[in-house]
């Protein structure tokens, strides 16, 4: 799917929920390579969206507010759609809790601009020395989730599937079935499943092994069971898709 192409408009989507203490610092850390910033308030009880609107002077920022909580996936989809309508060509997603370094945005965008990838995602497991600082249960949990993701998505070379620092070409994003993608914490891994159906090229981008971003949002030990079920369902869907494709080719 990947062709050489030049992206001239980069947009950042920031889903926010209970992140009032960090959101302004995240926005301030985003460099001039980004043309537009979409802060999606997912019906946040502390009014993060209103707080940004009242205190942020960055003219690139647009605040979008959900009247009902839709989960991180729902917030990202809302941001994607707004950015696509406004003409963005590369869509970056970064969390609002300050655990992701905005200066790395260029690293995520460059492979897409150069036509090397359709979708880039963070990987905190490149540096083994830094990984050793993680709690063992977290290392084990991520290893299990990564293995499940490899089976269900077909991307055998990727790791750290729950990492939410990502970038995607708008052309590819516009082909995703937004209404079918998981809205909650399974969002990132479900994205990989959908991208493989599109034959999209996915690339891991090394980043610091900061595991604090998962503490406030999810606990791996509590969602492995749920993820196992959902990965199993995705694997069944993938087998059905491949079987259907083979039957069509056979009939020809």
Residue ranges and their predicted role:
Residues 1-7, 179-252:
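Hydrophobic helical membrane-anchoring modules
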Residues 41-50, 68, 98:
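A conserved acidic beta->alpha catalytic loop
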